[in-house]
């Protein structure tokens, strides 16, 4: 199988170096945003395409997988002068090195995407046709000068991605989800659904999980809240993490899971494996889409039901989207305390409404009042996460479900983030604060040896 990343030597070439403060030049930004093309860039793209075709004829493609990258570079470098004979512009040393690296990327990896995949500061790569690429860096989207020769070039890269995982994408099956060898998630959609060129969205997979300590360093979580999260997990409260797309739900879920005891058996269930639990006893399950004939699908609901037969101490579902929410609540209510999941919602109250809707999708004949009672008895804590306008991800609130009043689920907010203004550089100013409510889970935390200072919950207490 081909790999999506080269060895560490590939990071040393000039093409992969980006300045954090200024990802692209003003000229590149003008070209990207207004369609202006640089003549030299056009020539280099055509040259690379021509040489790439020549290399396909000359190199032993069957042996490339077993050949070290440096050896491939040497082979390309040795025949490059001959291949450049008809090129009317001489290349300097830096341009030659860059060209060799790009040719290696074409042969062994994902072509123009390789430098972006190698850049650890980039979290998302968004390809809008062959000539427009955006990345997310430090929480903000920005254009990059990366481009493909044409739509055919982009489609070759897409086919390389999907064929490696036994999938296909074409006019009859115009969108697909896949995963790169490093775990990064990929969604591709092509014509006729994509009107202006094929679209690729890559959510990069973190090499190492982000811990609560790292989230504190990033300002996502105030230091004083770390023991609160620890108490919630160790006292086996069932947790629902709510937030929008890209708000950091899975990141927080992964970080909170680090407080689970090593002796516990954890079963994780995901549509696309992202969780990186560090405990020794973790059973990881992943859904399977239907094949080309529409058969063989295994859903999250199937896996949640099966997980109950696997003697789990806790069940962690990466994200509930449909009828599996009912089975997850059943698990939380039947001895699997301390289970956790996430949901797409903009507020804690919306999160509970979404879960109620999902129960309705399960096909179970249940009244709204009964569904809400299930939710109120199963979920103990709702953590709301979000992305601020400056791109930073924050814990926005921590709430506790307290029961039912009539047909309404009752909930109390324990902590919240309060925005107070903006700095000169546009960054959001604010602080976390306690609401003055003493959470009910403190008693359970005490019984598990977790002692949280009452000062932490004073109404005038500002956290971070």
Regions found by a protein language model. Name each.
Residues 269-283, 307-406:
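Conserved P-loop NTPase nucleotide-binding/switch module
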Residues 1-142:
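N-terminal anchoring/assembly modules that precede and organize ATP-driven motor systems
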Residues 391-464:
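NTP-binding/hydrolysis catalytic cores, primarily Walker-type P-loop NTPases
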Residues 249:
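Conserved lysine of the Walker
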Residues 119, 127, 132-235, 453:
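P-loop NTP-binding catalytic core
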Residues 241:
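Hydrophobic anchor at the beta1->P-loop junction of P-loop NTPases
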Residues 206-217, 254, 258-305, 329, ...:
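P-loop NTPase switch/communication element
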Residues 63-66, 86-93, 108-119, 161-178, ...:
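Active-site phosphate-binding and catalytic loops of NTP-dependent enzymes
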């Amino acid at each position: 199988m081909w790999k999506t990343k080269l060895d560490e030597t590939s990071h040393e070439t000039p093409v992969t170096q980006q300045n954090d403060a200024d990802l692209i030049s003003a000229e590149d930004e003008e070209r990207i945003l207004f369609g202006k093309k640089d003549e030299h860039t056009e020539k280099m793209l055509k040259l690379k395409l021509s040489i790439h075709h020549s290399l396909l004829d000359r190199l032993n493609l069957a042996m490339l997988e077993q050949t070290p990258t440096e050896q491939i570079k040497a082979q390309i470098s040795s025949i490059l002068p001959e291949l450049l004979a008809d090129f009317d512009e001489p290349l300097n040393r830096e341009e030659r090195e860059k060209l060799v690296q790009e040719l290696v990327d074409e042969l062994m990896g994902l072509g123009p995407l390789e430098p972006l995949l190698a850049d650890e500061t980039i979290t998302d790569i968004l390809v809008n046709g062959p000539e427009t690429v955006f990345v997310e860096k430090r929480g903000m989207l920005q254009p990059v000068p990366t481009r493909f020769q044409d739509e055919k070039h982009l489609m070759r890269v897409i086919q390389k991605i999907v064929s490696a995982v036994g999938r296909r994408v074409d006019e009859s099956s115009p969108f697909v989800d896949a995963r790169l060898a490093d775990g990064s998630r990929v969604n591709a959609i092509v014509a006729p659904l994509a009107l202006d060129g094929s679209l690729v969205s890559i959510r990069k997979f973190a090499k190492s999980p982000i811990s609560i300590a790292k989230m504190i360093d990033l300002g996502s979580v105030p230091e004083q809240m770390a023991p609160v999260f620890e108490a919630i997990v160790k006292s086996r409260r069932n947790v629902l993490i709510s937030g929008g797309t890209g708000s950091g739900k899975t990141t927080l879920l992964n970080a909170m899971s680090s407080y689970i005891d090593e002796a516990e058996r954890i079963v994780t269930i995901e549509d696309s494996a992202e969780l990186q639990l560090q405990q020794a006893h973790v059973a990881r399950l992943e859904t399977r889409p239907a094949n080309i004939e529409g058969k063989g699908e295994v859903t999250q609901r199937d896996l949640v039901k099966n997980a109950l037969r696997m003697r789990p101490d806790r069940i962690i579902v990466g994200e509930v989207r449909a009828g599996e929410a009912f089975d997850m609540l059943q698990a939380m209510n039947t001895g699997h305390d301390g289970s956790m999941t996430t949901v797409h919602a903009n507020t804690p109250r919306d999160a509970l409404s979404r879960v109620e809707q999902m129960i309705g999708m399960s096909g179970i004949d249940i009244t709204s009042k009964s569904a809400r009672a299930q939710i109120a008895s199963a979920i103990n804590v709702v953590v709301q996460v979000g992305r601020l306008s400056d791109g930073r991800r924050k814990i926005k609130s921590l709430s506790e479900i307290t029961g039912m009043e009539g047909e309404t689920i009752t909930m109390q907010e324990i902590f919240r983030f309060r925005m107070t203004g903006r700095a000169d550089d546009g960054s959001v100013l604010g602080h976390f604060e306690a609401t003055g409510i003493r959470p009910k889970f403190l008693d359970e935390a005490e019984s598990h040896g977790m002692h949280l200072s009452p000062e932490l919950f004073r109404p005038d207490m500002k956290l971070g």
